[in-house]
């Protein structure tokens, strides 16, 4: 287990235990995803909360001010606990570990699909079905990214499996076969 996981796992498991006891798992998963998006969209926030110069009480006030009307009380209390324990600086790692453990417990595979352009809902549905068949899982969480250098098509990865159906890859293969 990597060092960061040895720190993040107990916190992630504790949060999962609380939400399971309160039967709030799906609600919390959605809130955690929204919180991660919010933090990722405001890198200065994470930098501020990670600052060793700020006192714990100041960090708690910032957390309350920003998040009290955006997240449920269980998640807010969890963030305050992380501030108290000097772990708020690794909040994104803890929340990502929470999502990872939830997926493991629920047998949900995580697939990342990178395409040249934004995928339509129909395209996402077709890709999801194909990946479910290939990965041999019943449930799939799809994360989409855009990379114009693919020219067209997509690259999907689930665990250690990669499906490269991009135009850039096909052009590269054609170039290699012509050079022989």
UniProtKB/Swiss-Prot annotation:
It is found in: Cellular thylakoid membrane. Its main location: membrane. The keyword Thylakoid applies. InterPro entries: ATP_synth_OSCP/delta_N_sf (IPR026015), ATPase_OSCP/dsu (IPR000711). It comes from the Bacteria. GO terms for molecular function: proton-transporting ATP synthase activity, rotational mechanism. It holds the Pfam family OSCP. GO terms for cellular component: plasma membrane-derived thylakoid membrane; proton-transporting ATP synthase complex. Keywords: ATP synthesis, CF(1), Hydrogen ion transport, Ion transport, Membrane, Thylakoid, Transport. It is a peripheral membrane protein. HAMAP family: ATP_synth_delta_bact. F(1)F(0) ATP synthase produces ATP from ADP in the presence of a proton or sodium gradient. F-type ATPases consist of two structural domains, F(1) containing the extramembraneous catalytic core and F(0) containing the membrane proton channel, linked together by a central stalk and a peripheral stalk. During catalysis, ATP synthesis in the catalytic domain of F(1) is coupled via a rotary mechanism of the central stalk subunits to proton translocation. PANTHER family: ATP SYNTHASE DELTA CHAIN (PTHR11910). F-type ATPases have 2 components, F(1) - the catalytic core - and F(0) - the membrane proton channel. F(1) has five subunits: alpha(3), beta(3), gamma(1), delta(1), epsilon(1). CF(0) has four main subunits: a(1), b(1), b'(1) and c(10-14). The alpha and beta chains form an alternating ring which encloses part of the gamma chain. F(1) is attached to F(0) by a central stalk formed by the gamma and epsilon chains, while a peripheral stalk is formed by the delta, b and b' chains. Belongs to the ATPase delta chain family. This is ATP synthase subunit delta. It comes from Prochlorococcus marinus (strain MIT 9515). The gene is atpH.
């Amino acid at each position: 287990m990597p060092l960061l996981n040895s720190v993040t796992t107990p916190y992630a498991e504790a949060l999962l235990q609380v939400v399971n006891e309160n039967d709030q798992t799906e609600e919390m998963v959605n809130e955690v995803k929204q919180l991660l998006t919010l933090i990722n969209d405001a890198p200065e926030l994470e930098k501020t909360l990670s600052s060793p110069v700020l006192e714990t009480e100041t960090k708690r006030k910032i957390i309350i001010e920003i998040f009290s009307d955006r997240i449920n009380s269980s998640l807010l209390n969890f963030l305050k606990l992380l501030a108290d324990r000097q772990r708020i600086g690794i909040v994104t790692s803890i929340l990502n570990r929470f999502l990872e453990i939830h997926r493991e417990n629920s047998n949900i595979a995580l697939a990342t699909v990178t395409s040249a352009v934004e995928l339509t809902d129909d395209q996402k549905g077709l890709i999801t079905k194909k990946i479910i068949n290939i990965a041999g899982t019943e449930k799939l969480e799809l994360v989409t990214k855009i990379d114009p250098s693919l020219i067209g098509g997509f690259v999907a990865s689930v665990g250690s499996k990669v499906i490269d159906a991009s135009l850039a890859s096909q052009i590269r293969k054609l170039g290699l076969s012509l050079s022989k």
